[in-house]
Amino acid sequence: MDYTLTRIDPNGENDRYPLQKQEIVADPLEQHVHRSVYMGKLEHALHDMVNWGRKNSLWPYNFGLSCCYVEMATSFTAVHDVARFGAEVLRASPRQADFMVVAGTCFTKMAPVIQRLYDQMLEPKWVISMGACANSGGMYDIYSVVQGVDKFIPVDVYIPGCPPRPEAYMQALLLLQESIGKERRPLSWVVGDQGVYRANMQSERERKHGERIAVKNLRTPDEV
């Protein structure tokens, strides 16, 4: 069996992921506020309530590939207690999960499996890429390793590290919760492509750049 990979073009017309065309637009709630103050406030409160329930009840899909999954599993222990964020309910079926954590090295033969499992997840769904191997292939710049899972599925949060610590995984959960809290999804019962507004989140590298540049006294290797 032959496997092929296709790079994602967010603005492409014939791309499978994402199903809708992505473009930077204004928050649709602003239009409702100017149109009707009462209905705008009511819809804003309804969106906040729905997003609050979604972001505080994230069920991860139990899917690990290599050593990064060990660090992810460590976050479920009593020391870290990821249950504080409502993400302790591991699901063995993609149809019952809210987000997938691709933790570890993604090989070429594994890519179609991950893509199929992603298709089986129900909306709304999110993806976290955990570790250098999942982000960009890591040290494995070879023919059998995919150079980043974002080549065939959309990724919402990237976790750097080889492997990242459990604290990094919990920080990714907080960033994902913050992003979900700013989303605007259709509230009707109609199933279909109705458009999803996602906030343009600033990366942690850009957010902390000024603080890191301002540091004058660097720690010695013994103090790190």
Swiss-Prot record:
It catalyses: a quinone + NADH + 5 H(+)(in) = a quinol + NAD(+) + 4 H(+)(out). PROSITE patterns: COMPLEX1_20K. Its EC number is 7.1.1.-. The keyword Transmembrane does not apply. Its main location: membrane. GO terms for cellular component: plasma membrane; respiratory chain complex I. The keyword Transport applies. It is an enzyme of class 7 (translocase). It is found in: Cell inner membrane. Its cofactor is [4Fe-4S] cluster. One of its GO terms (molecular function) is NADH:ubiquinone reductase (non-electrogenic) activity. Keywords: 4Fe-4S, Cell inner membrane, Cell membrane, Iron, Iron-sulfur, Membrane, Metal-binding, NAD, Quinone, Translocase, Transport, Ubiquinone. One of its GO terms (biological process) is aerobic respiration. Binds 1 [4Fe-4S] cluster. It is a peripheral membrane protein. Belongs to the complex I 20 kDa subunit family. NCBIfam families: nuoB_fam, PRK06411.1. NDH-1 shuttles electrons from NADH, via FMN and iron-sulfur (Fe-S) centers, to quinones in the respiratory chain. The immediate electron acceptor for the enzyme in this species is believed to be ubiquinone. Couples the redox reaction to proton translocation (for every two electrons transferred, four hydrogen ions are translocated across the cytoplasmic membrane), and thus conserves the redox energy in a proton gradient. NDH-1 is composed of 13 different subunits. Subunits NuoB, CD, E, F, and G constitute the peripheral sector of the complex. This is NADH-quinone oxidoreductase subunit B. The gene is nuoB.
